[in-house]
């Protein structure tokens, strides 16, 4: 095998590996839970990220009073980000794929802090402050 062919084959293998990792990450099921509203806070249990045998990086919280769900990412026991899952481009509900949220309507992509990674959206997602209190997460909706 010549050097040029070797480099080409290695590049293809790297791209394939990267693609497959993103595919498998996207196949992981999202955990969806119901939240409750109390005193202008969306409340979920702090242990919502844990299942019997697995740990989730994020949970999707639905609540009937909210038009869109909220995606809550856990970075540590005290650091969370809560993002309104409404695309800032034209208002479609976003889908979560690992560390990114994607708009099925026009392809906008946001990272797990709500920042635009790929347009057409040019405004970051609405985020909510999260505090930990008595084994609960309080997501301020104010």
Q: Model-found features: residue ranges?
A:
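Structured, soluble extracytoplasmic/luminal domains of envelope-associated proteins
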Residues: 90-111
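N-terminal secretory signal peptides and thylakoid transit peptides that target proteins
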Residues: 1-25, 29-33
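Short cysteine/histidine-rich metal-coordination sites, predominantly Zn2+-binding motifs
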Residues: 101-107, 117-125
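N-terminal pre-ligand scaffold of iron-sulfur
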Residues: 27-88, 93-97, 124-142
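Generic structural "secondary-structure junction" signal
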Residues: 96, 112, 118-119, 127
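Generic short alpha-helical hydrophobic face used as a protein-protein interaction/packing hotspot
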Residues: 10-11, 91, 107, 118
């Amino acid at each position: 095998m010549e050097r040029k062919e070797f480099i080409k084959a290695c590049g293809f293998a790297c791209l394939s590996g990267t693609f497959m990792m993103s595919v498998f990450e996207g196949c992981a099921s999202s955990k969806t839970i119901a939240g409750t509203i109390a005193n202008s806070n969306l409340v979920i249990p702090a242990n919502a990220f844990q299942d019997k045998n697995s740990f989730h990086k994020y949970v999707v919280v639905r609540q009937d009073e909210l038009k869109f769900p909220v995606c809550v990412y856990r970075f540590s026991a005290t650091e969370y980000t809560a993002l309104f899952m409404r695309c800032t481009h034209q208002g479609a509900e976003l889908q979560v794929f690992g560390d990114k949220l994607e708009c099925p309507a026009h392809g906008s992509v946001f990272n797990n802090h709500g920042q635009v990674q790929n347009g057409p959206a040019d405004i970051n997602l609405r985020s909510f402050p999260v505090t930990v209190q008595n084994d609960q997460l309080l997501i301020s909706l104010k």
